[in-house]
Regions:
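NAD(P)H-binding glycine-rich loop region in Rossmannoid oxidoreductase-like domains
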Residues: 47-84, 97
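A generic structural motif
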Residues: 27-35
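SDR active-site strand-loop-helix element
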Residues: 9, 37, 62-66, 103-108, ...
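N-terminal Rossmann NAD(P)H-binding glycine-rich loop of SDR-like oxidoreductase domains
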Residues: 4-25
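Catalytic helix-loop patch of NAD(P)-dependent Rossmann-fold dehydrogenases
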Residues: 76, 83, 88-91, 111-154, ...
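A short helix->loop->beta-strand "cap" motif at the edges of active sites that frequently abuts
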Residues: 98-102, 148-149
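Rossmann-fold cofactor-recognition segment
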Residues: 35-48
Length: 158
């Protein structure tokens, strides 16, 4: 019997690379098969290809580490930032809702304004000050709205 599949998008980025690097040494590797993909294998902004790809693989879990991360460039290229950070996440969440797949969405501390004097909690008020932060928050909201029991958001800071 084959192991359930964990699909990791954005595998050439910082987080996707780190997941791959530590996968074999983790306890998760004994129970799940890892499939890392990047934009050259799967363009998340091409909804038709995305749905077809996921339909062939039937992953049990998707870790979405793909993102438009150029904070300054997002200000002038809002369409591209929202396409990957929000609209592609919506497509993933819709597919996961129908298929029963779990979705782990990697987000950012840029959803906050940075004014807090203590560490942010999971229920802290968001207030993004940039297009990048706003686009990532939109993606978070898609996951949490469509997948209240099987969608997870992990906010990171590098």
């Amino acid at each position: 019997m084959s192991k359930p599949l964990v699909l990791v998008t954005g595998c050439l980025g910082q987080l996707g690379s780190a997941i791959q690097q530590h996968w074999d040494a983790s306890q998760v590797a004994a129970r799940y098969e890892l499939l890392p993909v990047d934009i050259d294998q799967l363009d998340l902004t091409d909804t038709d290809d995305l749905i077809a790809y996921l339909g062939q693989l039937h992953p049990a879990i998707i870790i979405n580490a793909a993102a438009f991360t150029q904070v300054d460039e997002a200000e002038t290229n809002q369409e591209a930032a929202y396409a990957i950070n929000a609209e592609a996440v919506l497509s993933l969440a819709k597919w996961c809702r129908v298929s029963g797949c779990k979705l782990i969405q990697i987000s950012t501390d840029f959803v906050f304004d940075g004014a807090a004097t203590a560490p942010y909690t999971t229920d802290a008020q968001t207030n993004p000050l940039s297009v990048y932060g706003a686009s990532k928050l939109a993606g978070e909201n898609h996951v949490l709205d469509l997948l209240p029991r099987t969608g997870y958001v992990v906010r990171t800071s590098w």
